[in-house]
């Protein structure tokens, strides 16, 4: 099958999303990752529109990319200004990109109301701008803004705008669903009509306002489109752009279209999480293909089936996109879940062992009280080890006390925790302050234990979530605390439940520390 070229606009269109902004250094790092995975075109921004994009195009020239081409984005010339005098077009050329992509008006409504020029003059803007760029830049793409809405309003004029781009020898004409409202059945019909009039290579750029961006992109490829534009994780204005993390595996694995290599596809999940990290956003665990839950199984019947034949409940092998099968533990679990988790944790367990059923019943009883182990697998691993008698007790907490004090109305509250622990035959009694009672307790616990276990200095509390459970009444409701901790090697989650938020936090903190000590001991043991 013919090659479908991938055009990424995360660094420009993706940054128009609410709460997303990248430093120049971030954009350079993302560009390298996009290049590694095999993206053909990387749109870096709009030169001249802001200092950040100016700096990007200056700095990216110093970088060595293996195959990706850098694209600069802009608009057609202004009315009543010749291309060689137009600041926007001159700035595009001065940025020295591999590709220039400019957008122009397709919808007669926009021509009249936004540009306030005649329809004929708009055609001249499109032709003149593209012709000028073609004489100065290796490749030129034309984004037909609002094409599908424009076609529905005035099909003859919409086609004329594409013909103007074709006459100017644009290397690819990109049909844009800018408002994101076009349905797949409409898109297919319109592209078929376009192909009766336009012979130039066509691309597709869709937005997700109707939850159809990925579907529309794939339908477009089926209709002969050769370039697909989108963003990593679907970042973009309003509801986002077409998600390349869904489009790429669908093209390659479902539609058998050439786009990137097998080894590159296996880096897809890593790329997704890398971009989330630089955007300072938590990954969407329910995201197709690359999310943590994309291949997660909770029901016991499902788990039993996938252990024999993964395809029973997985539409493809997760390893193909760099993901993995996960077995969740909950009150829906069966023995298969427990055994699968034991195997994951390298814990030997027999399916006929009564302890398996005991663990299962314990989980159901604990979840009835409000515990949840999907995000707290470290707590679950410790639960299994305790049931099997393989849990080593590194220390015991004799008691603790937490004091919150506010001395003056205009001052911050003071939090102090006092704790007494026993390690072997030695007792350690210490105190620590913190930013709130939980932080104070965390500091005191680790302060008491670090002299015995120095490796605890590596641990940091990364995330802390509190949820009031609905079963209780008013202030007497139970509270579930989920804590994520980590060191330089890994991250792990623990859980605690109580009517008292400090006690629930204490349970989760205790599991976090114990898990770290168990893992450190296992690593040290494997080195001997």
Swiss-Prot record:
An example Gene Ontology biological process: L-leucine biosynthetic process
Result of knocking out the encoding gene: Cells lacking this gene show a great reduction in citramalate synthase activity and are capable of growth in the absence of isoleucine, whereas mutants lacking both cimA and the threonine ammonia-lyase tcdB are auxotrophs for isoleucine.
Annotated function: Catalyzes the condensation of pyruvate and acetyl-coenzyme A to form (R)-citramalate. Makes part of the main pathway for isoleucine biosynthesis in G.sulfurreducens, i.e. the citramalate-dependent pathway.
UniProt EC number: 2.3.3.21
Domain Pyruvate carboxyltransferase: 4-266
InterPro entries named among the record's database cross-references: 2-isopropylmalate_synth_dimer, AIPM/Hcit_synth_CS, Aldolase_TIM, Citramal_synthase, LeuA/HCS_post-cat, LeuA_allosteric_dom_sf, PYR_CT
Catalytic activity: pyruvate + acetyl-CoA + H2O = (3R)-citramalate + CoA + H(+)
Family classification: Belongs to the alpha-IPM synthase/homocitrate synthase family.
Alphabetized UniProt keyword annotations: Amino-acid biosynthesis, Branched-chain amino acid biosynthesis, Isoleucine biosynthesis, Transferase
Alphabetical list of PANTHER family matching this protein: (R)-CITRAMALATE SYNTHASE, ALPHA-IPM SYNTHASE/HOMOCITRATE SYNTHASE
Name this polypeptide is given: (R)-citramalate synthase
GO terms assigned for molecular function: (R)-citramalate synthase activity; 2-isopropylmalate synthase activity
Metabolic or biological pathway, per its Swiss-Prot or TrEMBL entry: Amino-acid biosynthesis; L-isoleucine biosynthesis; 2-oxobutanoate from pyruvate: step 1/3
Entry annotated with the keyword Calcium: no
Gene giving rise to this polypeptide: cimA
Enzyme class: transferase
Record carries keyword Ligase: no
Highest classification ranks of the organism: Bacteria, Pseudomonadati, Thermodesulfobacteriota, Desulfuromonadia, Geobacterales
